[in-house]
Amino acid sequence: MIELLFPGWLAGIMLACAAGPLGSFVVWRRMSYFGDTLAHASLLGVAFGLLLDVNPFYAVIAVTLLLAGGLVWLEKRPQLAIDTLLGIMAHSALSLGLVVVSLMSNIRVDLMAYLFGDLLAVTPEDLISIAIGVVIVVAILFWQWRNLLSMTISPDLAFVDGVKLQRVKLLLMLVTALTIGVAMKFVGALIITSLLIIPAATARRFARTPEQMAGVAVLVGMVAVTGGLTFSAVYDTPAGPSVVLCAALLFILSMMKKQAS
């Protein structure tokens, strides 16, 4: 049993290390809908990967990165409100991906695995890919932490201090896209954003500094992964949703504790 769970557990722990600090910025900057858009569009990457006979893992990363860059470009053109634009792109990309996959009669596709993930199907090659992605994400966040914080707290002051706002914003969106692309196969397109939001929202109730919040979010994510996989193994439930459910339970407990104190 341990041999079966360990690769998935290790993958989840690594993803939690990236999702903690990144999710903090998603919560601070209210980017959850942006994350949902990229997550839904990731299924389109799967469809293109299968259609072009390319590894869907890399196709998902490519599509999410391209979409993130496109959203930054469209954000500068205020013909439509950004939430309207995100809603249109999210559901259009998800629908197109589902239609393309359904038209591939010669290819057997497990849509449930892509929609809800399968942490228990992690291979050694997957672990290497996740590790590389997590190292890149954490390194960029560490490198740009001060600029990202300045932009989040006060864009005007950040601009005065010489922060290149558009470049930093693009970098944050690309890092978010990379994280979603890496994690999509293991957590699923429909629930991946929750692993960014819930641990960070839970940590926010206990942290006094941004750095504390990022660190606590990582710990919450690790506990959720461990608890969710254990629950999945004992009761034979889907691994990804079990992890998210465990994270949601931790959030509810944090709210109850905060109210009691």
From Swiss-Prot:
Belongs to the ABC-3 integral membrane protein family. Keywords: Cell inner membrane, Cell membrane, Ion transport, Membrane, Transmembrane, Transmembrane helix, Transport, Zinc, Zinc transport. The gene is znuB. It is found in: Cell inner membrane. This is High-affinity zinc uptake system membrane protein ZnuB. Gene3D superfamilies: ABC transporter involved in vitamin B12 uptake, BtuC (1.10.3470.10). GO terms for molecular function: high-affinity zinc transmembrane transporter activity. The chain crosses the membrane at residues 8-28, 54-74, 84-104, 122-142, 178-198, 214-234, 236-256. Pfam families: ABC-3. GO terms for cellular component: ATP-binding cassette (ABC) transporter complex, substrate-binding subunit-containing; membrane; plasma membrane. Coiled coil: none annotated. It comes from the Bacteria.
